[in-house]
Regions:
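Membrane-interface alpha helices of multi-pass inner-membrane proteins
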Residues: 76-92, 98-103, 132, 146, ...
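Membrane-lumen/periplasm interface segments of specific transmembrane helices
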Residues: 120-191
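Membrane-interface transmembrane helices that cradle and orient dolichyl/undecaprenyl
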Residues: 18-20, 59-76, 109
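Transmembrane-helix signature of polytopic, membrane-embedded enzymes
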Residues: 6-37, 54, 243, 247
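Perimembrane helix-loop-helix junctions
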Residues: 97-130, 138, 275
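Hydrophobic, aromatic-rich transmembrane alpha-helices
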Residues: 2-12, 186-235
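Membrane-embedded, lumen/periplasm-facing catalytic core of multi-pass transferases
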Residues: 297-367, 459
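Hydrophobic/aromatic-rich transmembrane helices and adjacent perimembrane loops
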Residues: 48-55, 87-92, 96, 243-246, ...
Length: 467
């Protein structure tokens, strides 16, 4: 699907070429667009960054076709915006591309009245699409947590069920303008950003920046010279659909950096880079031989430089899930509680135990045992008042437990019964998982006694905890 959409977009961009050249270059651009660190790296992985790009490519195709035909209809704009809104409702990380699309439309529409009309139509249809896929869940979240985006933007809505925080992952957002300007080059060689982005390598962003910078510098000098002769600006020589895509790309890159900076969220830009490389090369030189040579050099270099995201892979087997859990340990499922104090993503194991078993995740991206949110208050009330069987899911030796395991044991007055544990086998986690039976320490509160607060400290770290 992505290949077909990219091929169609590229075909529109190269519509003035000869049929064979247009189809050949469109196919080449689509292939190179999908041969990138993100699309290759996420094949067979659990992320959905590449799948959601369908909600970016489809609206872009509708818009560039309308711009190329000079007959862009309001219906096409509504449909494109509606699709974009639905995609953003499914995965909000594509919001920067929706904003960039609106900015690109404002830039290529000639009249102020047309711009205002396009903006109003785009905004209304986008909101409708967003509510189609996300409205129900926003209402549920508001009803339960008084935050329609829970837990995100909780610094605005201030739900008592989470910390007063935006919960945004801004760990790789550029801190300075210089860092932002250097970001396209940060994945061309080993850097801290490349390492934090699954050891990726890619030249396409750097190549685009170099070409664009070259053209802008040349444009400045030519503009000074041609202004006296009344010549149009050089960038006006690009077709309207090419200018639209170029503005979209630049605006998306800027907004994406400001909001996230997370490499895999830029999957649409990775795929759209090849046709824009060709557009910039064609604007840079009019000589056919030079164009062919430069495009060939850029495409071959980009192809050879690609290093996909370094994702852990599972070997092929009879079943994706190969999990063995100790069902014999669960003698009374409705009265069984399993605690996950370690922040590792082990909750998938719940699907392999009886559905009546209750699981509580105490330390994760949403909440920590040291928090004072309603979530932790509910967890404390549950644990202190629980009279059934309790287990801890952790490593096979207390000496390699995470500090959060120890904190939970101490805070709630719990102890493991060292003679009662059961191994868990899963190819999705490192060997050594165990289900430990828990008991209350002598003198620890429990049953009908009030729940004291947890230890008010944050763990210092603890031994490394591999997946």
């Amino acid at each position: 699907l992505s290949f077909g959409l990219l091929f169609a977009i590229s075909s529109v961009v190269f519509r003035k070429w000869t049929p064979n050249a247009r189809l050949g270059m469109a196919a080449l651009c689509a292939a190179l667009g999908l041969y990138g660190p993100i699309f290759i790296g996420e094949l067979g992985a659990s992320e959905n960054d590449t799948l959601i790009t369908l909600f970016v490519f489809t609206p872009l195709l509708l818009l560039v076709r309308g711009l190329a035909a000079e007959s862009a209809s309001r219906t096409g704009l509504v449909v494109a915006s509606l699709i974009f809104g639905m995609g953003t409702g499914l995965k909000p990380t594509i919001a920067p591309f929706a904003v960039a699309t609106a900015l690109a439309l404002l830039a290529v529409v000639r009249s102020w009245r047309g711009r205002l009309t396009a903006l109003l139509i785009w905004s209304a249809a986008f909101l409708a699409g967003f509510l189609i896929t996300n409205g129900f869940w926003m209402a549920k979240l508001w009803q339960q947590f008084h935050n329609p985006f829970f837990p995100f933007y909780n610094d605005v809505f201030k739900s008592q069920w989470a910390n007063i925080s935006s919960y945004a992952d801004r760990g790789v957002v550029p801190k300075t303008i210089g860092e932002a300007l250097a970001r396209p080059f940060a994945v061309t060689y080993p850097t801290d950003y490349a390492a934090r982005s699954y050891q990726v390598r890619d030249l396409r962003y750097a190549a685009l920046v170099v070409l664009l910078g070259w053209i802008v510098v040349g444009w400045v000098f030519r503009r000074i010279r041609e202004r006296k002769k009344g010549q149009p600006w050089p960038l006006q020589s690009l077709s309207v659909e090419s200018r639209f895509l170029l503005i979209f790309f630049v605006a998306s890159f800027v907004i994406w950096q400001a909001m996230f900076g997370i490499f895999r969220y830029a999957a649409p830009l990775e795929a759209l880079a090849p046709p824009l490389l060709v557009v910039l090369v064609c604007d840079l030189t009019r000589r056919s031989v030079a164009r062919i040579a430069l495009v060939t050099l850029l495409f071959v270099s980009t192809f050879l430089a690609v290093k996909p995201m370094d994702q852990p892979r599972l070997p092929f087997g009879e079943s994706f899930w190969e999990v063995k859990v100790p069902t014999a340990a669960i003698t009374d499922p409705p009265n069984t509680l399993i605690l996950l104090a370690n922040p590792r993503p082990w909750a998938y194991l719940a699907a392999f135990l009886p559905p009546e078993v209750r699981w509580v995740g105490m330390n994760n991206n949403l909440t920590k045992v040291v928090d004072q949110s309603h979530t932790q208050m509910a967890i404390r009330a549950l644990i202190y008042g629980y009279t059934g069987d309790m287990f801890l899911l952790s490593r096979n030796k207390p000496s390699v437990w995470h500090d959060y395991d120890r904190l939970v044991m101490t805070a709630y007055g719990l102890q493991v019964v060292e003679s009662e544990w059961w191994p868990i086998e899963s190819k999705h986690s490192r060997p050594g998982l165990r289900l430990w039976r828990l008991r209350r320490a002598e003198g620890a509160p429990g049953g009908s006694e009030p729940a004291p607060p947890p230890i008010p400290r944050e763990p210092a770290g603890g031994p490394p905890d591999p997946p």
